[in-house]
């Protein structure tokens, strides 16, 4: 009897493990797979009448009336008008704001003002869109403070030398770095915590993070450098507090003629962002920022080519970011309405519709109509076999071909009537004296291909 019990249990375990191998089943506690949203973060509310821009007909999400305040899709907080964030304007040491250095800022005063700003910008306490904090005047790591940002190193060392005039240069530099990073962490973390407390359903994070080296692809590399991966790993304290990641794959005029190179850069950053999510904040959403104008400030009529849409927006969609955010400035928006409208209707909108049709086709052919296709890795002109599937409940498998449930799995193809194999724990109960009792029926199963059927009973 013990031998029979052992073989029955072993068979159930083998069936369960074999069925689950390679599964992409989401599970009852996780959300269903969704296709990437596209969000219109362009302040085009002034575009009226014949120049109004209707992005919703292309499936693009927007705030009500395309406003930046009080909407349901997004809110963005810029350092110059949010709280009392300390910084040197344009990295100029002679123009400090709110103390200039983070270690000279007033965190309490900042949080008081930031609370007012959040309540004003997001009046809905149940807001569940993206909440982006945009701090670009300084970087929260000493090692990242190069070029114009080195002013924060210079001024931090100057401050520490004033505080400790008899210390050695090495001691001063060590303490300056420590004080700077500690102050940065306080401002970044406490601001996030405030936002999460006031609007707990929002997706909070900092624009431009994670980061990647901009020269990916110049040699034969396709990933962010080891150095930048280390920088991102050292920001673990930031990922632990974030609920969203907001990398930027913006293109600029100097990049417009290099769509292949741009593709590698975009793919490397999205891949790195997924690594950070996987290792440090599995519950974080990924919202990728992109543009449609190379330089909306000086050449607003110079829009992305279709090749560069493929290298940015299209790639982020196929790699299944939670959303792709199309951003632009409000500068001279009134005079840009006509060209924006033309580009949306003639290029951007039709391109998104084509991408959607291709993903619909992939869904049916690759995922048997039961999941969403996505690219695990960047791939130019991907074939259908380059895509993987995120399966809808209760399906799983490489092509969502199997049907399962939380307490177990079923091995027959989903198109067949499933015979569910219960979870192994269902075969046991605990008696009053604490011993485990085996409750499995006296029967054996046999497997032919993907089918399992009752072979015989004892």
Swiss-Prot record:
Any Pfam family hit: Glyco_hydro_56
One Gene Ontology term from the biological process aspect of the record: chondroitin sulfate proteoglycan catabolic process
Record note on pH: Optimum pH is 6.0.
Signal peptide: 1-22
Keyword Membrane among UniProt keywords: no
Boundaries of every EGF-like domain copy: 358-401
UniProt cross-references to InterPro entries, sorted A to Z: Aldolase_TIM (IPR013785), EGF-like_dom (IPR000742), Glycoside_hydrolase_SF (IPR017853), Hyaluronidase (IPR018155)
UniProt key word Disulfide bond: yes
Disulfide bonds, paired cysteine numbers: 362-373, 367-389, 391-400
GO molecular function, one term: hexosaminidase activity
EC nos: 3.2.1.-
Keyword line: Disulfide bond, EGF-like domain, Glycosidase, Hydrolase, Signal
Protein family according to the UniProt entry: Belongs to the glycosyl hydrolase 56 family.
Role of this protein: Endo-beta-galactosaminidase that specifically hydrolyzes chondroitin, releasing GlcUA-beta-(1->3)-GalNAc-beta-(1->4)-GlcUA-beta-(1->3)-GalNAc as the main product. Also hydrolyzes to a lesser extent chondroitin sulfates (CS-A, CS-C) and hyaluronic acid. May regulate the function of chondroitin in cell division.
PANTHER family recorded: HYALURONIDASE
Identification of the protein by name: Chondroitin hydrolase
Species of the source: Caenorhabditis elegans
Lineage of origin: Eukaryota, Metazoa, Ecdysozoa, Nematoda, Chromadorea
């Amino acid at each position: 009897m013990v031998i029979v019990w052992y073989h029955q249990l072993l068979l159930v375990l083998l069936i369960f493990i074999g069925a689950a191998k390679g599964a992409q089943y989401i599970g009852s506690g996780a959300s269903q797979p969704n296709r990437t949203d596209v969000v219109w973060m362009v302040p085009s509310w002034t575009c009226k009448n014949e120049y109004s821009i209707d992005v919703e007909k292309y499936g693009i999400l927007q705030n009500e009336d395309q406003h930046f305040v009080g909407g349901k899709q997004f809110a963005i907080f810029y350092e110059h008008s949010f709280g009392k964030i300390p910084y040197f304007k344009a990295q100029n040491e002679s123009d400090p704001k709110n103390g200039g250095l983070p270690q000279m800022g007033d965190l309490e005063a900042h949080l008081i003002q930031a609370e007012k700003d959040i309540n004003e910008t997001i009046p809905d306490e149940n807001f569940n869109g993206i909440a982006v904090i945009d701090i670009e005047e300084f970087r929260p790591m000493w090692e990242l403070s190069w070029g114009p940002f080195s002013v924060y190193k210079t001024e931090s060392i100057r401050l520490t030398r004033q505080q400790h005039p008899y210390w050695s240069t090495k001691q001063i530099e060590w303490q300056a770095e420590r004080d700077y990073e500690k102050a940065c962490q306080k401002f970044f973390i406490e601001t996030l915590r405030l936002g999460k407390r006031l609007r707990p359903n929002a997706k909070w994070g900092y624009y431009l993070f994670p980061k990647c080296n901009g020269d990916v692809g110049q040699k034969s590399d396709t990933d962010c450098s080891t150095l930048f991966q280390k920088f991102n790993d050292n920001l673990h304290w930031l990922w632990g507090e974030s609920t969203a990641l907001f990398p930027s794959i913006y293109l600029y005029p100097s990049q417009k003629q290099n769509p292949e190179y741009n593709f590698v850069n975009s793919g490397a950053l999205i891949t790195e962002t997924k690594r950070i999510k996987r290792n440090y904040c599995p519950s974080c959403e990924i919202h990728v920022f992109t543009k449609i104008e190379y330089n909306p400030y000086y050449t607003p009529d110079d829009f992305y080519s279709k090749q560069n849409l493929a290298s940015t927006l299209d790639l982020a969609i196929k790699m299944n970011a939670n959303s792709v955010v199309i951003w632009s400035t409000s500068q001279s928006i009134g005079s840009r309405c006509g060209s924006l409208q033309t580009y949306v209707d003639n290029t951007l909108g039709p391109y998104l519709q084509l991408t959607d049709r291709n993903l619909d086709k992939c869904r049916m052919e690759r995922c048997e109509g039961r999941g969403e296709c996505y690219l695990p890795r960047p791939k130019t002109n991907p074939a259908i076999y380059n895509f993987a599937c995120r399966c809808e409940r209760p399906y799983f498998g490489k092509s969502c071909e199997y049907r399962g449930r939380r307490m177990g799995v079923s091995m027959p193809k989903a198109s067949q009537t499933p015979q569910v194999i219960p979870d192994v724990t269902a075969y046991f109960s605990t008696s009053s004296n604490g011993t485990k009792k085996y409750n499995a029926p006296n029967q054996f199963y046999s497997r032919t291909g993907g089918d399992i059927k009752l072979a015989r009973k004892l």
